[in-house]
Amino acid sequence: MKMTLKELGEMLGARVQGNELLTISSVGTLESAQTDQLSFLANSKYRSQLESTQAGAVLLSEKEANNFQGNALIVKDPYVAFARVAQRLDTTPKAAVGIHPSAQIDASAQIGQGAAIGANAVIGAGVIIGEHCQIGPGCVIGEHSILGSNTRLWANVTLYHDVHLGQNCIIHSGAVLGSDGFGYANERGTWVKIPQTGGVRIGDNVEIGANTAVDRGALGHTEIGDGVILDNQVQIAHNAIIGKHTAIAGGSIIAGSTKLGQYCIVGGNSAIAGHLKIADGVHVSGGTNVTSEIREPGTYSSATVAVENKLWRRNTVRFRQLDDLFNRVKLLEKQQKTQD
């Protein structure tokens, strides 16, 4: 697909600078874009690349456009505008086209108009697949699961029974939705499994990354709100509730029955303990361990940043001496008070 700068400007509500009839076929970085591509400047540290870019046109803020003589689309937020254009010019192939003859579809399943199901997919009893869904090769959809319209499952996604997905969701390869939660009772050292009888409920416009796992609820459902984005290899434990438009980066773990608020951001390789409530608008830095409730929005961190190894070793030794140092300071304070 190709669009002129004028057409893109109308789509974005942008002001066009330069040749309105220039045809754009795709997007690219300032450093690598060619004359038929659109790029963007969203961070001033890349301003030097703007001066030498070969891009046919650039998405710019009003401030940056004052110093640029080339073709441009002037917008409020260049990065968001870039995302919109990238969506419009997207050439990603479909996960499936038509219904492959090797797909195994239960007679009781309901398949919406225009839905596509790839090779060797398995659709269980009572499944409802909405209009224009794409089910990639090798996917398994368990009994009584529901997919809203325009939802896309890439190859080898597994949905257990009673998993509900909203509209316009994207689930990447290897994701498993609805597996058993980690629920056991301990009887004198022996683990007794607790059947996980709940389901999974996922809202509209949710994207779930490759090899991510969302466990089903023990009693009641695990819930993921509208607009949530989960990166690759994220673990959502049973009965967790993820508020709408929250983002969780790769390798993070949300333990069971934790309620994570709306519009939160969880950095990569973070862990949030179970049975906690996290307020709306909380930003957890990468590598952070959250072990208690967070009641106010803001940024929270616990990880130690990388330093030169020799310094790290010295600091580690000092950390192990911290309790002794505390006791010595406490004794000195006591002696000082006695002298006073």
Curated annotation (Swiss-Prot):
Domain of life: Bacteria
EC supergroup of this enzyme: transferase
Gene3D superfamilies documented for this protein: 1.20.5.170, Hexapeptide repeat proteins, MurE/MurF, N-terminal domain
Similarity field: Belongs to the transferase hexapeptide repeat family. LpxD subfamily.
InterPro entries on file: Hexapep, LpxD, Trimer_LpxA-like_sf, UDP_GlcNAc_AcTrfase_non-rep
Catalytic activity: a UDP-3-O-[(3R)-3-hydroxyacyl]-alpha-D-glucosamine + a (3R)-hydroxyacyl-[ACP] = a UDP-2-N,3-O-bis[(3R)-3-hydroxyacyl]-alpha-D-glucosamine + holo-[ACP] + H(+)
Enzyme Commission code: 2.3.1.191
Described purpose of this protein according to its UniProt entry: Catalyzes the N-acylation of UDP-3-O-acylglucosamine using 3-hydroxyacyl-ACP as the acyl donor. Is involved in the biosynthesis of lipid A, a phosphorylated glycolipid that anchors the lipopolysaccharide to the outer membrane of the cell.
NCBIfam families xref list: lipid_A_lpxD (TIGR01853), PRK00892.1 (NF002060)
Keyword Lipid metabolism assigned: yes
UniProt name for this protein: UDP-3-O-acylglucosamine N-acyltransferase
Pfam annotation, one family: Hexapep
Any GO BP annotation: lipid A biosynthetic process
SUPFAM superfamilies xrefs: Trimeric LpxA-like enzymes
Gene: lpxD
Active site: 238 (proton acceptor)
GO CC term, one of those recorded: membrane
Pathway assignment: Bacterial outer membrane biogenesis; LPS lipid A biosynthesis
Any GO molecular function: N-acyltransferase activity
Keyword field: Acyltransferase, Lipid A biosynthesis, Lipid biosynthesis, Lipid metabolism, Repeat, Transferase
Subunit structure: Homotrimer.
